Amino acid sequence: MAHPHLLAERISRLSSALEKGLYERSHAIRLCLLAALSGESVFLLGPPGIAKSLIARRLKFAFQRARAFEYLMTRFSTPEEVFGPLSIQALKDEGRYERLTTGYLPEAEIVFLDEIWKAGPAILNTLLTAINERHFRNGAFEEKIPMRLLVAASNELPEADSSLEALYDRMLIRLWLDKVQDKANFRSMLVNQQDESDNPVPASLQVSDEEYQQWQKDIGAISLPDPIFELIFTLRQQLDNLPNAPYVSDRRWKKAIRLLQASAFFSGRDAVAPIDLILLKDCLWYDAQSLNLMQQQLEILMTGHAWQQQAMLTRLGGIVQRRLQLQQQQSDKTAFTVIKEGGMFSRRPHYTLPPEASASTLTLLLQKPLKLHDMEVIHITFDRSALELWLTKGGEIRGKLNGIGFAQTLNMEVDNAQHLVVRDISLQGTRLALPGAAEDSMPAEIKQQLETLENDWRQQHTRFSEQQHCLFIHSDWLGRIEASLQDVGEQIRQAQQC
């Protein structure tokens, strides 16, 4: 078996070759290739003339030896046109019911069925067995069919509660395509002279039958780690609790997990990673409403939980709360405390300064800076005698803001804990403390917790960086996930700097 990274590079080059001359169809080609390499089915929804059939034809060139079959369904289509005509000779000579399948669906590796919902019950029933079991009943015999990829297409969805739902449920990947939108791409498409029937894939990139069979075994060996299962189960629970969520059968979940294993395998990994889960948005929707819903739910999962973003923010919130508690405790210890001396007949308590405040002028620090008289203030200088008079009799108190200029009127009070509190115009308050009493450094407990959290964040970011190289995921998703992780990292850094 090729080295995992060499295999991933080969599949990437194979996809690039298949995409040549197809504009704004890279994602569709890549998912169809993933489906072909893992033996799954694809449904393409979109208006006529947007290269749905060409996508299917291209996939034939991914393999060294692959036969293709395509058919446009109508209400009058018969099983003979899809599965092959009856052998008149076998019926006449031996009385045996047998179809001549050469050149028809039972002998094709790549199958494209356009306007699939117009097929009649006889075709649909046989097709269900072919998709489910990869077998075709030809007369008295069960024949194994080599189909690796079924691409079904239509410009409409099947009607709800119709007989078509069983077939629709078998189509694991569902892609909603539209016309070419970008101006430059539209021009390139108009002037492109490439023959659509040409093989754009070098022989060295094409997949042999032996490789394909071996890869099916290797895909099954890709592990599903417990944290990834928890994410999947969380998504399943979220969908079950939403009133308008699509019904997702257990069969579809199981097939979707195999697709995630294939994504991991062809990305050079030995286990499913969170990045692979984005593929579920193309597997679990049913109609336009559920398509948007799946997009929203996957975004919540990817930007909030897949790399522990929300869990880290919750931890950060707890650390910040603990820090505030410690700061409050420290504030209580370091705040400037006056002595209460209420007289026997005094209705108003009065206070005196503590012995350590013996200087003629006192400079007290604000435990938290405030804006006073249009100035950012970090300390206030008081005349000791004026402060003593205010503590005894009340009235107006003045102090020099940051120790400069004239003394300014202050909104100051003594709180219940006998601490001096100064307030700004919005009544935001902070306690005052003697210089040297305030502890500005971050508590060791908080510093350690923030360092641990930052290390955990770095590990998650490294995991994302290592796993983000996935051919089958659109780059827009990578940008949103990176932004969510950077936001968490920035909040941690801000907390460390406070």
UniProtKB/Swiss-Prot annotation:
SMART domains for this protein: AAA
One Pfam short name: bpMoxR
Alphabetic keyword roster: ATP-binding, Chaperone, Cytoplasm, Hydrolase, Nucleotide-binding
Protein EC: 3.6.1.-
Reaction catalysed by this enzyme: ATP + H2O = ADP + phosphate + H(+)
Subcellular localization(s) per the UniProt record: Cytoplasm
Control of this protein's activity: ATPase activity is stimulated by ViaA.
CDD domains assigned: AAA (cd00009)
Subunit structure, as described in the record: Homohexamer. Interacts with ViaA.
NCBIfam families: PRK13531.1
The family this protein is said to belong to: Belongs to the RavA family.
Protein name (database record): Regulatory ATPase RavA
Species in which this protein is naturally found: Salmonella schwarzengrund (strain CVM19633)
